[in-house]
Design a protein with these regions (language model features):
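ATP-dependent adenylation/nucleotidyltransferase module used to activate substrates
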Residues: 1-121
Length: 121
């Protein structure tokens, strides 16, 4: 058995052992989320891939969407959800004093907003 099948089988066992009914994967357009979502799709179990742009370069969003569409065409167990989070991020940012708006804090806030969105799904 090749490595990708071993990982995919392990993921399927994890889903079963934890009594879960689907994988939920945030897809950014990068290699990590592409590999993870593909391995999860290979299980044959339900997978929801989620695109969550926040003031994102359209090219980066398109990489993610193209990957999701490829996954959906190759594997019938894939659902795609796109949630535009820019307005949610801006509203949150408006409620935080501007003195805390440094680049690192804002980048971490984007990541945490995406994380909590995935938990809601």
């Amino acid at each position: 058995m090749n490595l990708e099948n071993r990982i995919s089988n392990w993921l399927k066992e994890y889903l079963f052992n934890h009594k879960l009914d689907s994988f939920v994967i945030g897809v950014s357009g990068g290699i990590d989320s592409a590999v993870t979502s593909t391995l999860c799709a290979m299980t044959g179990e339900k997978i929801i891939v989620v695109i969550m742009p926040i003031h994102q370069n359209p090219n980066q969003t398109n990489f993610g969407l193209n990957h999701c569409n490829w996954l959906k065409n190759k594997y019938k167990n894939v659902d795609i959800v796109e949630i535009e989070l820019s307005s949610s991020f801006e509203e949150l940012k408006q409620n935080i004093p501007i003195k805390f708006h440094d680049d690192l804090s804002l980048a971490n806030t984007r990541a945490r907003l995406r994380m909590t969105t995935l938990y809601l799904i």
